[in-house]
Amino acid sequence: MSDKTKGIIAATAAGAAVATAALTVPPVIMQRVACARGREFKLSDAFKSKDRKSKRSMLEVKRKVREIKQREYESVEIESYDGLKLKGKYFANPQKAKRLIICFHGYCSSDYHDFSYSFDYWFERGFDILLVTQRAHGESEGKYITFGIKERFDCKSWVEYAVKRFKKNVEILLEGVSMGATTVLMASSLKLPKNVKAIVADCGFISPFEILKHVMKKSYKLPAFPYLYLTSAASGLLAGFGFKDASTVDAVKRTDIPIFFAHGSSDGFVPCRMSIDAFDACASDKKLFIAGGADHALSYVVQKSDYERTLGEFLSKYIKNFKI
């Protein structure tokens, strides 16, 4: 082999190495940014929006958070299927109606923020309330957020904990907001106890791949290929899950649990069509509520009366003596 040939081969190899590094390093960074435990959502973040309706809605949420934080609760804990300690807050209802709602918050959000506004609605209807802190958030253990992929199994574990603690005659609802909605929808196809009577899914996305593809295109003008595919591969190596490992659309095709879908028509983070697609695919009894003009996770606040009425009419078919 001539020195010239060796030089060409060496240069080609060096070029390939640089190209590989250029394609590999950014996806690893992107995976860590998207999935690693990080900064928790703060209410002040919401006020960066220029939309007045959203700001007014967030002021109401902020007020409700202050109220709910004054209530007494029991700290509870379970162990996930992969050995993580997961935390929750259990609020016992004096009505003792044998009803429990288990609530799952969204991406980098918190239990108080996502469920403060609906807390009184459930409490007045006799529900004990279990606010779950999702893995890789708050006091719960976990290095990586998995956008519902692993959280769906955590959901199943929380249901099994509830049935064991509150006995077999307890009626259970599952509620999720944003990534929490994706969590409960993905869990809907698992073998859950019959105690789960219905699911409330507010502004969930279809899968990690679909929501990250949307964010990359909208915010960074980047195509899914090759970056998102490489980032998914990096996630498989670093966090043990790929962005296409599960989807809400696939899950609800195989569920028999009644599902109430809600979404704001003006959602600036998760496109409303993602709930519509999941609703269309759902094999069980279902209802879709679109809140006109509502931004992300604000459907309940923006159209409270219509939301509660539509939700109540749906749930009254599955929960005994449910107050509409």
Residue ranges and their predicted role:
Residues 121-141:
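Conserved alpha/beta-hydrolase
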Residues 186-242, 250:
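Hydrolase active-site cap/lid region
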Residues 248, 257, 271-280:
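Short alpha-helix in the alpha/beta-hydrolase fold that links the catalytic acid
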Residues 301-324:
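Catalytic active-site module of serine/aspartate enzymes centered on a nucleophile-bearing elbow/loop
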Residues 254-256, 261-263, 267:
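Short beta-strand/loop motif that positions the catalytic acidic residue
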Residues 145-166:
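Alpha/beta-hydrolase active-site loop
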Residues 107-121, 134:
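The serine-hydrolase catalytic nucleophile loop
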Residues 13-79:
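An N-terminal hydrophobic leader/cap segment in hydrolases
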